[in-house]
Swiss-Prot record:
InterPro entries: Helix_hairpin_bin_sf, Isy1, Isy1_sf. Involved in pre-mRNA splicing. Associated with the spliceosome. Disulfide bonds: none annotated. The lineage of its organism: Eukaryota, Fungi, Dikarya, Ascomycota, Pezizomycotina. This is Pre-mRNA-splicing factor isy1. Its main location: cytoplasm. GO terms for cellular component: catalytic step 2 spliceosome; cytoplasm; post-mRNA release spliceosomal complex; post-spliceosomal complex; Prp19 complex. It is found in: Cytoplasm; Nucleus.
Length: 239
């Protein structure tokens, strides 16, 4: 009699479970997650499966901190966490496609079911806990940290840039006071002003333009002479 009663209860349990599945009432804690995520059309069910994935991620992230684990166990556990992270992302995409909340708006941060941020979560393959100290992985993190420090270093503390700058950069080169150089620069400046004047000779002022009262524009020769005088005074001040 006891055997028949157990069979009847088992059959009744399976019947009730099938009814609950048809009605959308699913116990996420006792049921396997469906593999076909894109075929799920119930937002509450997707949220339950996502919550279950978050619980597993939180549990495995806590376990990967165990100092008794070997390197092989840490690698396998880190792979499992990354696989769960991808599954969580797929559930979030399905929830968003069904019109539910957009959990991917948090900027790559991952939180467990208690609202605590999971360190190391984000896009791409990540390393959690002691996986960051694995041989080969630790060197990658150290190299990335050094590169980041070099990029964020202020320019005034970078001696390698200042070593390439000599006195000529600040205008104290020996050839700055050469008469031939001054004459050449003056000729080039005069030629540039003449070319500019020729280009603007055929242009007419815009409609409604009026000259400023008691203001006369200098000629090209006057401008060139003024530039030469300024440069001569600057050189004398340096002496």
């Amino acid at each position: 009699m006891a055997r028949n009663s157990e069979k009847a209860q088992s059959m009744l349990f399976r019947f009730r479970e099938a009814q609950a599945a048809d009605l959308g009432i699913i116990d996420a804690g006792r049921t396997r997650r469906p593999r076909s995520i894109t075929e799920q059309d119930s937002i509450p069910a997707c949220e339950k499966w996502r919550g279950q994935v978050l619980k597993e991620i939180s549990r495995k992230v806590s376990r990967i901190q165990d100092p008794a684990l070997s390197d092989y166990q840490i690698r396998d556990l880190n792979d499992e966490i990354n696989k769960l992270m991808r599954e969580k992302h797929m559930w979030e995409v399905q929830i968003r496609n069904l019109g539910g909340p957009n959990y991917m708006r948090s900027g790559g941060k991952v939180y467990d079911e208690a609202g605590r941020e999971i360190p190391g979560g984000g896009r791409g393959y990540k390393y959690f806990g002691r996986a960051r100290e694995l041989p080969g992985v630790k060197e990658l993190f150290e190299a990335a940290a050094r590169a980041k420090q070099d990029d964020e270093k202020p320019l005034e503390t970078r001696d390698d840039l200042r070593k390439q700058v000599d006195a000529a950069y600040y205008g104290y080169a020996p050839d700055e006071e050469d008469e031939k150089l001054l004459a050449y620069e003056a000729a080039r400046e005069r030629q540039a002003f003449e070319n500019l004047a020729k280009a603007a000779a055929g242009l007419e002022p815009p409609p409604g333009w009026e000259p400023l009262p008691e203001w006369e524009l200098p000629t090209m020769d006057e401008v060139a002479q003024e530039l030469i005088d300024r440069r001569r005074r600057r050189l004398l001040d340096q002496l």
